[in-house]
Amino acid sequence: MGSNGLNGVKDTNGANGAHANGASLSRSLKPGIYAPIPSFFVPQTEDLDLESFASHVVRLAKANIHPLISGSMGEAIHLTHAERKTLIQTARRALDEAGFTDVPIIAGTGTGSTRETIELCHEAAEAGADYTIVIASGYFAGALNPKALKTFFTEVAEKSPIPVIIYNFPAASGGIDLDSDLITGLAEQCPNLCGVKLTCGNVGKLTRICATVSESSFATQHPRKNPNAPFLVLGGFADFILPSTYVNAHGAIIGLGNVAPHATARLFELSQATLQDPSLLPEAQRLQGIVARGDFTIAKTSIAGTKFLLEKLYGYGGVPRTPLPPIEAEAAAALWAHPHVQELVRVERELSGKLTA
């Protein structure tokens, strides 16, 4: 996932040293595709299924997809502090043992209060995370005006021992939808912020933020605290990876990366390549269409649908932790049979070299 200067982001992977918490400075945050990893559970007991989790993290790394642990897809709201730390430690160990020592880990640290969010940031760093991603709590959404939200993200960024990504996801935060002025203002004022994930799906907002952070003056006037953590603008859905490339976005953090890692990684690579070779645009457009249709269809079934597809494709996945229900049998059958899903599966198998059903 090396950036090679993509969209104005310098690749600083050659840096040496480590944070006091053990997070290596050489694990740069680079443009590309990241996947929010599901948390897998043992049937009946609902204990963490660490074996499946570790295997999945490595499977994605082999496809050049990097992990986000304990995010929305990872059912972070259902996890204890200790479980969050265990997942980070398990992922780091699995990646290192598989030879992916340079793959960074992003950890979700969103929760209720500012105090606990900061506490989770410290725990994530201690467990081996390189970066955190933070969502505003939606419990008191009606009372959190722009000033309160700015104060929240500023304080978390200042007190987190590792760089922080802003997570804008209105559906998971009581309708809180950060606008581009607030996000760019935070980016300018908080050197420990290293990006934003826009699961609002607002391409206009993404374009405006990219216009600010891609200016050459931004990096010089607002340098990051960690030189390996430039401010990345990342989409939250797979259906606008190609269009976002043309406004200087840096990739995406997408649930579809779990189901179709090769297809989504290839789409990002192709999208970047079209900037230098426009003859590749028709191929990129074709793949973007397949990915967009598949993403839209699968997203309707949420976490349970993604876990069902993982079970169907790879033999692990299971069901969500209660009270989140599993996908109904009829809905699961319809999802698997859907032509958009079957088309995506076919492309994924072709790109991964697995041609058998």
What are these regions (language model features)?
Residues 2-7, 13, 242-357:
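Structured C-terminal cap/extension of enzyme domains
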Residues 2-7, 16-175, 352:
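Active-site beta->alpha loop and helix N-cap motifs at the rims of alpha/beta catalytic domains
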Residues 49-52, 56, 83, 87, ...:
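General structural feature for long, well-ordered alpha-helical segments within catalytic domains
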Residues 95, 160, 190, 310-314:
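A broad structural signal for alpha-helix termini and local helix breaks/kinks
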Residues 135-152, 197-212, 332-342:
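Repeat-unit-sized solenoid/scaffold elements
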Residues 155-159, 163, 170-300:
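Catalytic alpha/beta core domains of metabolic enzymes, predominantly
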